Amino acid sequence: MIGLDTNVLVRYVTQDEPMQSAKASRLIESLTAASPGFVSLVTVVELVWVLQSCYASAKSDVVMVLETLLHTRELTVEHADIIWQALRKFVANTADFADCLIERCAHAAGCEYTATFDLNAVKATGMKRIG
């Protein structure tokens, strides 16, 4: 298994930098189900942030990228089940993906609730506002 950093996935997805994109493509396309790439939870969060913030990717495009990652047999995605849950929340409302993931991770850990000051996160994800 080979760990994949956010920048490798960004280059593969965007194909915007010829040399790095080609190297990322060769690496990712060489992966197999027996020797997969590993995508950490942090990498997923960074990938979403980079695509939305730096590339102005539409929410629908980000969702498609995440669904593709999660369906790819040649990738092992850390906590894929929790990411799927967060993705469903992300699709269904206006919350940031990170907020959806934070709430779902806390839920999976057995937390009674997730505390926040963010009103949008309260409305969209079911977090509890404090203060």
What are these regions (language model features)?
Residues 8, 43, 82, 101-102, ...:
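Alpha-helix capping/helix-boundary segments
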